[in-house]
Amino acid sequence: MGASKRLAELSLIAQQNADANTTKFMAVRFGNVLGSSGSVVTIFRHQIAVGGPVTVTDPNVTRFFMTVEEAVGLVLQSATEGAGGDILVLDMGDPVKIIDIARQMIALSGLREGTDIDIELTGLQAGEKLFEEVQHLSETLQATEHPCVMRLIATSDSQINMSLISQDLESAIIDT
């Protein structure tokens, strides 16, 4: 997870823990939402339709995915089940290689990679990671009443750990 998203979560937790707070603050962590504008499937569909190339940053890049329905369900589930300060995440299974999605979409379009259409490796963008992290190193997963929704629990005494914030910020600066 990127530093800015992590800081946003920590800000929500700090608001939840504020003395005068009367609002219930929670966060959900999404994977990539299939079919949303800007999603890899939408981009690949367009690239295939115009004859390519299909662009992939790196053959080893993996991402977690969820459907629009799963994203909506996660938000609704968190609203009904979540407690203030919660961070909830959907069990999205194993991460998927982006290049495998590209190859599958090419094949499903009746085309052959390398013959009918090419895959072009473009290189990672500044700040882009090979692997997404759904769970921070300082967190453990806890089951909820819903079998596919997990609660993230901070493993340290303080959920707002300035050392981790500093590490996240350093990582963001180095990655850019």
Label every PLM stretch briefly.
Residues 1:
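Catalytic tyrosine of NAD(P)H-dependent dehydrogenase/reductases that use a Tyr as the general acid/base
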Residues 4:
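Active-site helix of classical SDR
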Residues 7:
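Active-site His/Glu-centered metal-binding helix of metallohydrolases
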Residues 12-176:
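Strand-loop microenvironment adjacent to phosphate/nucleotide-handling motifs in alpha/beta enzyme folds
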